[in-house]
């Protein structure tokens, strides 16, 4: 299981599992060893937790399974990672520490099963920093694991990572590669990786006829039972595109303004202000995080399917697939904090990398954490700069996931960061779901907002189809990186966070000085006493 299994909430996950089981077809084993049912039961199960437990039992979810392939008997254990949980704001389950849960499960396997190999399917992931890389930590802490098949971080490992006798492999994102590996058992019973490759899943791969027929039938169902309600068909062309949009990978690797984020955030404002149900309250800022974006737009025709695939996650309170746009108000001080979340937090949590329309800022990556932003202001469509007033309320539009995710980021800061969405009167919002932008009795979905924006572009070549404007061929100073190590640039414009951190450092230094002073004083006293004894 991964974090996006919870995008459709507990009921959605339960429905998926129950539908799969009820299909009568052979379903794959589902393994996850660190759901903390004991803790959940102590607190009393809510309705969502009851639904998931019932679905888990009906499907047959286990901590691990034993698979016999030829002469080899292997145990496969599954685990849900820490960062995955942070990225699942709608998940109602509690989880044990991944390492401890896997360690306990492996001990159980060793005790009760006579297996030749232990493999772990992990939604923990790998990072560049080995000390924070969840699956590398797992490999070191649970050395009895022979193979970790790693997910979550979309890492495309061209070569396996090895720690001791444990290998970690990962084939990237969205089924674009098929991982293939071979292992040979050594005399001591452990396994050696003898071959490993990532095979691209491209159009060159001939589709299986029966599978393709089933996919086509399901696609027809999507048209009839879902897209028709929005007035679209799957293959309908929304716009023609000659712009080279940033790749999805770049949203995770580049910490700067990207045109893919620009067009999506602009779409939010357009859709709200051009809805027939628009209440006339101008949108000041729209925010899109990288964590919700699932695909880019290639050159050529952009279809409804392309747009839906680019923002396909989630579900609204209405029970219809797709995250809705929500409307809320933040103070100017909180808007500046939004910029600081991107500048300071998103390198540790790339799903929190933010792309804004209406909010421009500059940051220096070399400055103190939580004080990296050096300039922050609003802009209008004509590019006019508008200074932010700290105590003024500003109208912000984003998708439901973003609102929930920013709440998770605030929790992770242990009170250092405080951002409280409000209604237009300044009252705190109790439930973000209630802030969904409605068109009569229907939620305005984020993907639909993008589709409408695409359709709104001018038809510049006269063929009756909109064209993506040249505006998106370049960036527009929405997120400026000031790569300076100049001492003045590093310390100018200190905020409360830098003062707080500086104060903590000063206290730490004072404590060290006092400790050193006391130790030296004690040493001098001891020497004086010894001297007096010797003189006697």
Place the predicted regions along the sequence by residue.
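Acidic, metal/ion-coordinating pockets
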Residues: 1-204, 264-267, 329, 346, ...
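Catalytic centers of hydrolytic enzymes
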Residues: 87-93, 172-536
């Amino acid at each position: 299981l991964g974090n996006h299994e919870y995008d459709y909430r507990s009921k959605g996950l339960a429905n998926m599992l129950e539908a799969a089981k009820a299909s009568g077809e052979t379903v794959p084993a589902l393994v996850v060893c660190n759901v903390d049912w004991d803790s959940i039961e102590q607190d009393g199960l809510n309705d969502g937790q009851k639904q998931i437990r019932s679905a888990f039992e009906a499907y047959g979810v286990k901590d691990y399974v034993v698979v016999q392939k030829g002469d080899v008997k292997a145990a496969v254990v599954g685990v849900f990672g820490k960062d995955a949980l942070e990225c699942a704001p709608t998940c109602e389950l509690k989880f044990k520490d991944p390492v401890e849960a896997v360690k306990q499960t492996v001990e159980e396997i060793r005790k009760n099963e006579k297996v030749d190999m232990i493999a772990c399917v992990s939604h923990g992931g790998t990072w560049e920093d080995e000390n924070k890389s969840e699956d590398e930590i797992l490999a070191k802490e649970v050395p009895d694991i022979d193979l970790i098949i790693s997910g979550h971080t979309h890492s495309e490992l061209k070569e396996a990572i090895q720690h001791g006798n444990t290998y970690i492999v990962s084939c990237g994102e969205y089924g674009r590669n098929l991982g293939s590996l071979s292992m040979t058992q050594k005399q001591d019973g452990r396994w050696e990786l003898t071959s490993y490759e990532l095979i691209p899943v491209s159009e060159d791969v001939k589709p299986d006829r029966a599978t393709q027929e089933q996919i086509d039938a399901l696609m027809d169902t999507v048209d009839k039972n879902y897209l028709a309600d929005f007035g679209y068909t799957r293959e309908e062309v929304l716009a023609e595109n000659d712009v080279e949009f940033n790749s999805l990978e770049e949203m995770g690797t580049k910490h700067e303004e990207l045109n893919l984020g620009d067009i999506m955030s602009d779409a939010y404002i357009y859709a709200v202000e051009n809805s027939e149900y628009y209440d006339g309250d101008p949108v000041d800022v729209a925010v899109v995080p990288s964590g919700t974006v699932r695909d880019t737009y290639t050159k050529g025709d952009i279809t409804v399917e392309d747009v839906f695939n680019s923002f396909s996650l989630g579900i609204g309170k209405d029970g219809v697939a797709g995250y809705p746009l929500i409307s809320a108000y933040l103070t100017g001080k909180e808007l500046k904090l939004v910029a600081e979340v991107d500048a300071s937090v998103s390198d540790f949590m790339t799903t929190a990398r933010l792309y804004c329309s209406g909010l421009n800022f500059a940051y220096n990556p070399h400055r103190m954490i939580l004080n990296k932003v050096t300039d922050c202001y609003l802009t209008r469509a004509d590019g006019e700069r508008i200074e932010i007033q700290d105590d003024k309320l500003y109208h912000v539009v984003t998708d439901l996931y973003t609102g929930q995710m920013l709440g998770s980021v605030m929790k992770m800061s242990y009170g250092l960061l405080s951002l409280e969405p409000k209604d237009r009167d300044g009252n705190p919002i109790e439930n973000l779901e209630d802030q969904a932008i409605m068109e009569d009795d229907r939620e305005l979905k984020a993907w639909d907002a993008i589709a409408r924006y695409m359709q709104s572009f001018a038809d510049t070549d006269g063929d009756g189809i909109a064209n993506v404007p040249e505006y998106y061929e370049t960036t527009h100073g929405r997120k400026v990186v000031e790569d300076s190590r100049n001492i003045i640039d590093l310390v100018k414009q200190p905020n409360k966070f830098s003062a707080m951190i500086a104060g903590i450092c000063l206290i730490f230094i004072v404590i060290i000085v006092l400790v050193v002073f006391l130790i030296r004083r004690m040493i001098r006293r001891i020497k004086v006493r010894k001297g007096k004894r010797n003189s006697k």
